[in-house]
Structure formats: C-alpha cells, structure tokens
C-alpha cells in the first residue's frame, strides 16, 4: 500500500463575498456559517483526501477579496499548483473580476497551474435569487482558457468536493512528488552548506566572495 503523501498548494481568488471561505470551510469541515466574517489578508487551511488510492494533502490559501488586498495575491499564488477562481452566479461583476484573475494567473503564475473556474451560490436560485451569469458563460470562458468548470453551493455542499477532487485528478501525482523531492533535496543541501560553514569559516567567506 502506498503511504506517501503528495502536497498540492492551492489558492482561492475572487471578488469579496463570493463565498471563497465558505467553499473551503465546507471542504475542510463540512460546515457552513451563514454570516461569515470577511477574510483579512489570507487564511491557511489543509485537508487530506484519497485520490486513486493516493493520499493528497491540499495546502489551501484563501485570499481576501477586498480590493485593498489584491496586491498581496501574487505572494500566495506564486508556486501554486492549482487555483480556484470563484464568482457569484447572481453577481455579474464578480464574473468580470473572475476573468481578470484568470488572465493574471496565466500571465504571472506557474505555466503548469491547474485553474478551476467556480460559479458559487447556486442554492440562491432555488431561494428566489435571479441568475445573472449563465452557466454557458462560465463554460465558454473555461473552454477558451483551458480551465476546469464547476457550479457549486457552499451552503448545501453541492459539487464542492468535486472541485477539489477534479483538481487532484488533473495534477500528475508523479510531478508533484518530484517537486516535493526537489524541495527536500534543496533543504538538505542548505543544511550541508550550513554544516560546512560551521566547521570552516574560511570556506564560507570564500564562497561569499565569489
């Protein structure tokens, strides 16, 4: 039995109040808070799932949607292997913002990043809310930009797990394992350098001069 764990760094992006934090809460705790406080800066959560008999650990960065925090986003999506770009199906402005995030990710994030476009709050359509972003619009954008596409309800849990499982299935686990191995090797090398420096200050100074 394979007991290795593959870590996947995932970031959530989107306008304020589209339900990013609620999606994460539903995925991690299977819970929903009706009046959740806005995220300040970013929140970090983890969740483990089994995909094709392999354990995957999602390291989730839930970023704030307020405009004043937008400049911090690159710090969180840098080196991310996956991103959720979330919009509210009842708010067309949030879909426009989602387009912006997709464009920014393609320009500045890793070229191999897996992006899922997520239309949230479909439960509101059963509660008398009016859909302002057609499903076809989301599907078209996803097809044009090579994205995964889902419509979800963080409130009811509909399709939320499917989003994360879909992303996990798209990321080659071998590649993720190689990245983890390379990271561990770099850390090991750094430790060896520190050890040598401690034993021989002259060598360390010589290296710095180069």
Swiss-Prot record:
Signal peptide region: none
Effect of residue 66 to L: Abolishes GTP hydrolysis
UniProt topology in membrane: Lipid-anchor
Comp. bias intervals (Polar residues): 199-210
Subcellular location: Endosome membrane; Mitochondrion membrane
Entry-annotated residues carrying Cysteine methyl ester: 210
Motif Effector region: chain residues: 36-44
Residues recorded with modification Phosphoserine: 188
PROSITE patterns: RAB
Keywords tagged on the record: Endosome, GTP-binding, Lipoprotein, Membrane, Methylation, Mitochondrion, Nucleotide-binding, Phosphoprotein, Prenylation, Protein transport, Transport
The keyword rRNA-binding belongs to this UniProt entry's keyword annotation: no
Chief localization: membrane
Regulation: Alternates between an inactive form bound to GDP and an active form bound to GTP. Activated by the guanine nucleotide-exchange factor (GEF) VPS9 and inactivated by GTPase-activating proteins (GAPs) GYP1 and GYP3.
GO cellular component labels: cytosol; early endosome; endocytic vesicle; endomembrane system; endosome membrane; late endosome; mitochondrial outer membrane; mitochondrion
Comment field (misc): Present with 8759 molecules/cell in log phase SD medium.
Function: Required for protein transport to the vacuole. Involved in two vesicle trafficking steps to the prevacuolar compartment (PVC), regulating the docking of endosomes and Golgi vesicles to the PVC by interacting with PEP7/VAC1 on the PVC membrane and promoting SNARE complex formation. May be involved in recruiting the MON1-CCZ1 complex to membranes enriched in phosphatidylinositol 3-phosphate (PtdIns[3]P) or other charged lipids, leading to recruitment of YPT7.
Family: Belongs to the small GTPase superfamily. Rab family.
NCBIfam families: small_GTP
Subunit relationships: Interacts in its active GTP-bound form with PEP7/VAC1.
Protein name, entry field: Vacuolar protein sorting-associated protein 21
Gene: VPS21
């Amino acid at each position: 039995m394979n007991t290795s764990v593959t870590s996947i760094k995932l970031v959530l992006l989107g306008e304020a109040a589209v339900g990013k934090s609620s999606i994460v809460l539903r995925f991690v705790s299977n819970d929903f808070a009706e009046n959740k406080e806005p995220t300040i800066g970013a929140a970090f959560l983890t969740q483990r799932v089994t995909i094709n008999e392999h354990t995957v650990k999602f390291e989730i960065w839930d970023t704030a949607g307020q405009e004043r925090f937008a400049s911090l986003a690159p710090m969180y999506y840098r080196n991310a292997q996956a991103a959720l770009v979330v919009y509210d199906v009842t708010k067309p402005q949030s879909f426009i913002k989602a387009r912006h995030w997709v464009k920014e990710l393609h320009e500045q994030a890793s070229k191999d990043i897996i992006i899922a476009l997520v239309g949230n709050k479909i439960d509101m359509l059963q509660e008398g809310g009016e859909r302002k972003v057609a499903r076809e619009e989301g599907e078209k954008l996803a097809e044009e930009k090579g994205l995964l596409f889902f419509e979800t309800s963080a409130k009811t849990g509909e399709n939320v797990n499917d989003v994360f499982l879909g992303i996990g299935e798209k990321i080659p686990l071998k590649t993720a394992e190689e990245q983890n191995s390379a990271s561990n090797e770099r850390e090991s090398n750094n430790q060896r350098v520190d050890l040598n420096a401690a034993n021989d200050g002259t060598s360390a100074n010589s290296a710095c001069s180069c």
